[in-house]
């Protein structure tokens, strides 16, 4: 899947290293497909009760829980991804737990957050680049280690 994306998006080695590092960390090494917390915990913590998520009723908190490698949350994000992908995840939210659609959610996030620009910045200022891409400084050391490892491996592989 990543190979197809790198060709289609014409990504450089450092951009692929950044893309893969962010994906690896955010998806817990491709293991995360759905928020593990119970509906009761989600409701109690009011995790997705923010108006920015576009949820219109209490049931939406559970229905549009974090899913996919991009951890899409809320009716609004599900709708935006659905428009882009032409897969109706608003009607069928569980579709985001399918590997190919989950990966596609990551590609969508990459495009939404201008991943190429962030990846180019990563060589100069990884913290700023990663924070800009994810939206906050989360697990930066882990992201940096994976990025450097990817970069080393890919640079060695292309010689």
Protein language model regions, located:
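Short helix-to-loop capping/linker segments positioned immediately adjacent to catalytic or ligand/cofactor-binding
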Residues: 6-10, 93, 115-120
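A generic secondary-structure signal for well-formed alpha-helical elements
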Residues: 26-30, 76, 110-117, 137, ...
């Amino acid at each position: 899947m990543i190979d197809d994306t790198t060709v289609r998006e014409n990504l450089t080695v450092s951009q692929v290293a950044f893309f893969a590092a962010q994906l690896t960390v955010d998806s817990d090494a491709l293991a995360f497909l759905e928020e593990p917390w119970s509906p009761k915990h989600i409701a109690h913590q009011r995790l997705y009760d923010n108006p920015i998520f576009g949820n219109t009723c209490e049931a939406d908190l559970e229905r549009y829980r974090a899913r996919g490698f991009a951890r899409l949350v809320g009716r609004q994000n599900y709708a935006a991804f659905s428009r882009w992908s032409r897969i109706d995840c608003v009607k069928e939210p569980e579709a985001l737990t399918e590997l190919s659609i989950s990966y596609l959610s990551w590609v969508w996030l990459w495009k939404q957050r201008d991943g190429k620009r962030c990846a180019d910045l990563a060589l100069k200022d990884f913290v700023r680049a990663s924070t800009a891409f994810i939206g906050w400084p989360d697990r930066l050391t882990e992201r940096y280690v994976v990025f450097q490892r990817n970069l080393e491996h890919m640079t060695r592989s292309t010689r």
